[in-house]
Amino acid sequence: MFKIDNLCYRYKKTSPYVLDGVSLELEKGEIGIMLGRNGAGKTTLFNSILGISRPVSGTISYDGIDMTKASRSQRARKIAYVPQNIQFGTLSVYDSIMLGRLSYFGVRAADSDRRVVENIIKEMKLEELAVRSVSELSGGERQKIAIARAMAQQ
């Protein structure tokens, strides 16, 4: 379960709250959507979920783990984000997907990390692209690689 409970956020101690008592519950398999006018706090809420911004009060939890107190590595194992425009540089498709495993290994990937990546490549039918540079791919193919990287976080 993903739960936001009474989340409050403001940019400065003297400024008004951008988020004031936001609450939400999503059961496994449910999909949520954020809609709102400009300046409504969608990006601020999203940044709080990702751990980029720290709320003044309230909690964000996933499977009972308080994400507002979780380490970056713990959050990466529970929350994945696929931006609309992602930069890959000159990485190969395989290496780019492997980056999704960073929270699981230190300096080097283990055999288990390689198996996860290879299974995702097979599952998403990316075998023919695996050795190519992401910079050579179309926009849609890049988006697919970004999703594969998020899946590698498990």
Where are these regions (language model features)?
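The feature captures the beta-strand-to-loop junction immediately N-terminal to the Walker
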Residues: 35-37
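Conserved ABC transporter NBD signature motif
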Residues: 58-66
